[in-house]
């Protein structure tokens, strides 16, 4: 069903529909690049520029008006060659963070994505801590951001932003200090447990993706996608889509906003439909993350 869940004492299970995507994928003729959402992406160590590129490219392909990437200095040339539409700021490993620039970037953004390819280095952790402490718009935490938080939950102390966690089952197991098998027994329960523990919305990625929200036994079960999504970089793409949708939600008037959980569920649904579209053009075995991004055009 394609509507927000009501207040119920018993667990609620629902899903979103393709028509629900119109609010994020349809543009008003009177808008501009600022009103369609500005997304800040903190991603990419020196060895993982591709994660930053895929995430940022997915942001723009999902309808956001602008994207800025904060990445390691060694990624400067490959980033601009791969994605000339992006703006960027840079940090250097084992050097002080560019805090003034980061504060300006965070104030500029309507949503922030942190983690794809970031690494778990000392400087990457400092960057994540600084971001968490100074972000007031929706914050999507993925990949290495989740791995760092699993090792040190205090990273999130003092966070004022709404949070969306996007773990695959391995990352979820680390976040909950459980085994993968334990996390797979009850997908909704494990997603809900992470949402409660980290006071966030949790998108538990697996063959069936489940989205849970803190404080509510309400679960969105994703109905799109296929094994085509099981490819390197696919999670970076989902993080970008989620950031774009969260930014668009942030730009909406309060009376029109949907829940953060439904926003995240819609991103997972769009990701799945894009994978389906990519699979139709080749086969599940040959789909790449870049093709998933191109598949967004067919939704």
Regions from the PLM with identified roles:
Residues 1-138, 143, 147-164, 169-299:
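Small-residue (G/A/S/T)-rich helix-start motifs and N-terminal tracts that mark the onset
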């Amino acid at each position: 069903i394609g509507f927000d869940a009501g207040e119920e004492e018993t667990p609620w299970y629902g899903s979103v529909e393709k028509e629900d995507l119109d609010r994020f994928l349809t543009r008003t003729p009177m808008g501009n690049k600022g009103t369609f959402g500005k997304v800040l992406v903190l991603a990419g160590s020196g060895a993982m520029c591709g994660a930053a590129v895929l995430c940022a490219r997915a942001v723009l392909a999902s309808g956001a008006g602008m994207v800025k990437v904060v990445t390691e200095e060694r990624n400067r040339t490959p980033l601009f060659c791969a994605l000339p539409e992006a703006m960027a700021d840079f940090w250097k490993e084992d050097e002080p963070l560019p805090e003034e620039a980061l504060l300006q970037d965070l104030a500029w953004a309507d949503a922030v994505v942190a983690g794809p390819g970031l690494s778990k280095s000392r400087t990457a952790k400092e960057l994540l801590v600084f971001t968490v402490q100074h972000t007031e718009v929706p914050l999507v935490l993925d990949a290495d951001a989740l791995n760092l938080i699993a090792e040190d939950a205090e990273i999130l102390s003092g966070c004022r932003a709404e949070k969306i966690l996007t773990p695959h089952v391995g990352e979820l197991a680390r976040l909950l200090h459980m085994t993968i098998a334990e996390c797979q027994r009850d997908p909704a329960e494990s997603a809900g447990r992470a949402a409660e523990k980290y006071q966030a919305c949790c998108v538990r990625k697996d063959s069936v993706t489940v989205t849970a929200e803190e404080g509510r036994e309400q679960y969105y079960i994703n109905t799109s996608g296929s094994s085509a999504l099981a490819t390197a970089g696919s999670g970076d793409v989902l993080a970008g889509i989620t950031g774009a949708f969260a930014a668009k939600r942030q730009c909406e008037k309060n009376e029109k906003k949907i829940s953060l959980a439904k926003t995240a569920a819609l991103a997972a649904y769009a990701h799945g439909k894009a994978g389906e579209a990519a699979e139709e053009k080749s086969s599940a075995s040959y789909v790449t993350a870049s093709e998933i991004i191109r598949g967004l055009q067919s939704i």
